[in-house]
Every structure is written in structure tokens, then in C-alpha cells.
């Protein structure tokens, strides 16, 4: 962290966990295991120390938003409309965004009375592979230009205005948008939007994606650690694909392991690391909270915007 983060307060794990009264995590070890990402590590102690205080903080922000909306309604002399509380979650590939998002979905639905919580990943807003091929940018998949940012903005606008929306579905197994398949997203009490690009600006700079967020989280870690987690995940995906010819990873199961490791490392260097350094990490300071993970995946530091 540099002077770029002077407007953040650095909080140790020990201090953070003391900011919320100790309660029993509202999920079991088995549930936690079922929602964690393929190569991630998380414990019920992490839920107690990190995520329950975070869920409590989010509820504080939600109440503050509702109070402001009520006061604005009085000023405008009209009844304020209830809107979903939208949470953006960003960070590198393989850093654990999905685990954080799925866990928050459970915690908010179980700690806020009668709350409904929707979870959306921005992978569904990637252009289909055929479109990327036609545009000559298949090798730029994951970079800003490979996303239909206007569609993402339109989705956020409609959700913010209380409309239910159907969005495309992306499959990591086939490495493409699934034709004819849609995810129906309700305008719930909370809508969590997770993806590497959620803090980035569309090419139309007059509108910012972050303008739609009521709270935002960046999951951070050292570059060497993220690379190690990415390579580990890549190899584990191969083991799942051994008997699945439809999987994107099946082709790699037919290659010598040395070639596979070399290929995965090259993908990390040329795509994921470049994307992280040029487009993802520079948006880090747009988050309200930064969760920093150590080598063993444990969150050791929290940065809260002042």
C-alpha cells in the first residue's frame, strides 16, 4: 500500500474482530465447505473474525442509505422508493472473490430479518467466444474490451430501479456463454455483483459502474501468492475434466504435465497478470473496504475508507 491509500484506515485482524460482538456463525462447516471456491481456504473462525463484522458494517451502510433516501423524500415532497442495496466485489482472478461473495450472500440472508439476497457474476457479460473471434480479441478475453459493459450498466440501472432482469450465463467448464440459458435476477434487498471488472469504467466515461454501488469490496493479495493460487486452481480443474470431453480443460489432460504447467504460467503472465496490473489493481482504491489475504489465504489486514 502506498500514499494512494492515505484515505483508508488500516485495521489489523485482531482489532477488526473486536468490533463486533461474538456470535455463533449462522452456517455449518459443511455449508462453508460447499460455497468456497475450488482452491480457496476458509474456516468458521474466519467467518467469526472477518465476515460477521463485515456483514454488520454493510447493514450500517444500508440503514444510512435508507435514512438518507427518507430525508431526500421529505425534501422533494414525495415518497421515497425502496431500492436494492447493491454490493460490488472485485479483485484478481483466483484471489477468492467468489468465496467472499457467496459467504456474504448467506450471512446477509441469515442475519438480516427476512432479507432476500441475489448474487451475480459479471462473467455473464463477457461477449460470446464467437463474437470475440470475429472481433479478433479472443486472446484478450477478460480484458475490459471483452465485456459488454453497456449491457452491464443497463442491468445495474434496471436492478437499481427495482426491476427484475434476466442475464446471460457463463460456464467456466465450456469457457463460453451458454446459449439460450438465462439467470433470473430479482430486485432483492441486497444484490451482490462480483467480477474482476466491477470497478472499471466503460468506454462511455460519463457513467461509472461504481455509481450504482452502495458498498464495495476489493479482495487483495500479493501477486506471487495469487499466481500460485491460479496455477494450483488450473491443475485442479484438469483433474475434474479427465472424464469430461466437453470441458475446456479436457484438452490439457492429454498433454504432459510439464507442458500444461508451462502453458498455465504463460497464460498467467500474458493475460491475468497483465490484466491485474493494468486494469484491476488500479481500481482497488475505489472500494469501501479492502480485504488483504496472506499466503495461506487468511485475511490479515483490512482497509476501511475514511
Curated annotation (Swiss-Prot):
Broadest EC class?
A: transferase
Location of the protein in the cell: Cytoplasm
A GO cellular-component term linked to this record: cytoplasm
For binding ATP, which residues are annotated in this chain's numbering? 91-98
CDD domains in UniProt: PanK (cd02025)
Q: In which pathway does it act?
A: Cofactor biosynthesis; coenzyme A biosynthesis; CoA from (R)-pantothenate: step 1/5
Listed GO biological process terms: coenzyme A biosynthetic process
- Tell me the domain of life: Bacteria
Keywords for this protein: ATP-binding, Coenzyme A biosynthesis, Cytoplasm, Kinase, Nucleotide-binding, Transferase
Q: Does the keyword ATP-binding apply?
A: yes
The reply on keyword Kinase is yes
From the UniProt record, list the reaction(s) this protein catalyses.
(R)-pantothenate + ATP = (R)-4'-phosphopantothenate + ADP + H(+)
Pfam families xrefs: PRK (PF00485)
Query: So where does this one cross the membrane?
Result: none
Which GO MF terms does the UniProt record name? Answer: ATP binding; pantothenate kinase activity
**EC numbers, comma separated:** 2.7.1.33
Q: Which family does it belong to?
A: Belongs to the prokaryotic pantothenate kinase family.
Q: What is this protein called?
A: Pantothenate kinase
Q: Which organism is it from?
A: Streptococcus pneumoniae serotype 19F (strain G54)
Which gene is this protein's source?
A: coaA
